[in-house]
Amino acid sequence: MKFQLSAILIIILFFLKSGSLLSQQIYLSPEGNDSNPGTMYQPLATMPAARDRARILRSENSQQPVEIIALEGEYLMLKPLELDHSDAGTAVSPTIFRAADGAKVIFRGGVEINGFEKVNDNLWKAFVPQVAYYDSYFEQLYVNGRRATRARSPNDGFYPVRKAEETIAEKGTGRMPQVAVQKIIVDSSDIKDITGFTDQDHEDALVIFYHNWDNTRKRILSLSKSEPAFFIAGEGMKPWNPINSKSRWFIENFQGALDAPGEWFLDRTGYLYYIPLPGETIENTIFHAPILKEFIKISGVSPGQTVSNIRFENLTFTVAGYRTPSTGNEPAQAAAPVGAVITLDYASDISFTGCEIAHTGTYGLWFRRGCNNCSVSKCYLHDLGAGGIKIGETTLRNAVNEITNNIIADNNIITDGGHIFPCAVGIIIFHASDNRLTHNEISNLRYSGISAGWIWGYAHSPSKRNIVRFNHIHHLGWGELCDMGGVYTLGASEGTIVSDNLIHDVYSYDYGGWGLYTDEGSYGIVMENNLVYNCKNSGFHQHYGKENIIRNNIFAFNIRAQLQATRVEEHRSISFTNNIIYFDKGTLLTSNWHKFNLLSDYNCYWDTRTKEVRFADNSFIEWQKSGKDTHSVIADPMFTDPGNFNFNIKNLKVAKKINFKPFDYTQAGVYGSDEWKKLGATGRDIEVEFESVVDRNESRTKK
């Protein structure tokens, strides 16, 4: 009898967990109607209506799961889905938003634009009445499933800044002036396009600056009458990262820049202009313009009143926008203030599985304030205005239960981001702890792949015990920004582990294309079993920090140097042991590696060009006499095929001598079906384009 009761209990729990046979079901269809009851044969049309119906069902029966099942098709979202504490489920009766089995379900936050006509063979136009009559101006346009280029000058690349001068209007009490005007001096040939600007051009056009790790986006106030220069205004420039003669810029969104295939321009009277790409016709080209900036808002009240136990499964959210404020955007590392199309506050046990987020103006997801035990798994995030996933707040809270923790991002593809905010990050952890970022494929971004921590220096930081494992992070930077890392850390991070990651092809504009990068105050971090290659400045760099352990890694083929350190401090900065450093160009060490306080031993160094490896100005023997690397070796690890990036070690004698433990770096990245893994793979066209960026910049440097 006990056995029978146990079996029955197991069956009941199974069905409750699966949320299927015993669930209360609400159906959605593109052909539905929100006045329907939400049955399979009389479905609803929108998610807000389904949410409202779910609230009624929960009030009548809170013991059964509620499933909102979307049938095949495309759904136009006219407003975001907003969930609050009243929508919370329980562990055994969650609320589930999912696609019907086998269905392709797309929620679109934008409308299709029709009515194009030819102005001539190389220019089309359409009238968009919503822009003319309802102030529905948009700044992104998606054409046949790709992000089209807003008219810009130059069409590719950047113009140089020759000089920037600042006049402070109001100093304020902060680290930078509160109000200031900047005069940007440029080449006369680069300013000719904007000398005839109308008042409307000044209101609409955006000049975008790239300076080190930041971007500044501003309107042009006026042009100088005495020299090739223009004026912008807003906050004062950051003394630690101002616009200067090393900065670059381009300008977009004025009709005079509309001159290249694939570009578009929208004027304030409602006329949309587009130059078609080869092969595009009015009949075979579909245009979508965003009307929403976000898809989902999940908002609890407090740590004691969270939104909990909600699942999203196999849904696609696509086409969302971003409208630039009239004052533009001040620079911000990692595009930290920029929102996301899905935002959660005071949320627990919320999961996103098998979902797709694409064609956005901002980040993908943000687990912001007071979130815990949430997950994102097997999701595909691409064509992003900013980055992929944000965890935690930039504001430091005093109450522990206000701090986001235990968020899992596993087996996701995050690629092709930074289209509006190039300084955005693939996955970033601000003030948050105990998170796990595993098996993610992160690529084709203009800044860092993963970032953890948000305190500069040794002050208290709640960002601890974060796990970054088995991620494949590659093709970052693209020669556009500086000061980036495949994995980037900040502040006291005791218990944080960065291991088993495959990081390669990180290329900055000037300095700062690093694989593993422990920046200001990084403390208590273990980095082990990582393979890092083809990074511009070095495979590993520590700006400053203490008691970080860098062990059992392979650093190979990095371009300028292999190892780098900047600030020399009295305490021990790192322990560097059991690593293999293999290179064929550049130097072994750069900056102050030879000066700062480190324990370095049981490493293998090999320069394929010579057996005389130099440690800054020292020979190996001189280096050892200084107390470093006394048990290390200069030896060929005999990788299987390093030219094709096969770094399996064959020289087991060397491995044993330095206590190196081989690791399987092929396990990094996404897992599952061949189709899923293929989706995450970088196409050869992207690799070739990236290689051309590297070759072009390296050739310029040598000149």
What are these regions (language model features)?
Residues 236-243, 252, 280-300, 305, ...:
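Beta-propeller domains
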Residues 69, 76, 82, 96-98, ...:
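Extracellular beta-strand solenoid repeats
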Residues 79-80, 321-327, 361-367, 385-391, ...:
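Short glycine/acidic-rich loop motifs that flank beta-strands on beta-rich extracellular proteins
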Residues 79-86, 92, 96, 524-646:
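Predominantly extracellular beta-rich ligand-binding scaffolds that present long acidic/polar faces
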Residues 1-24:
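Bacterial Sec-dependent N-terminal signal peptides
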Residues 25-351, 356, 397-401, 626-628, ...:
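Extracellular polysaccharide-degrading/modifying enzymes targeting complex plant/algal/animal polysaccharides
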Residues 24, 64-66, 73, 79, ...:
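The right-handed parallel beta-helix/beta-solenoid scaffold, focusing on the short coil/turn
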Residues 308-319, 348-359, 371-386, 399-418, ...:
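Right-handed parallel beta-helix
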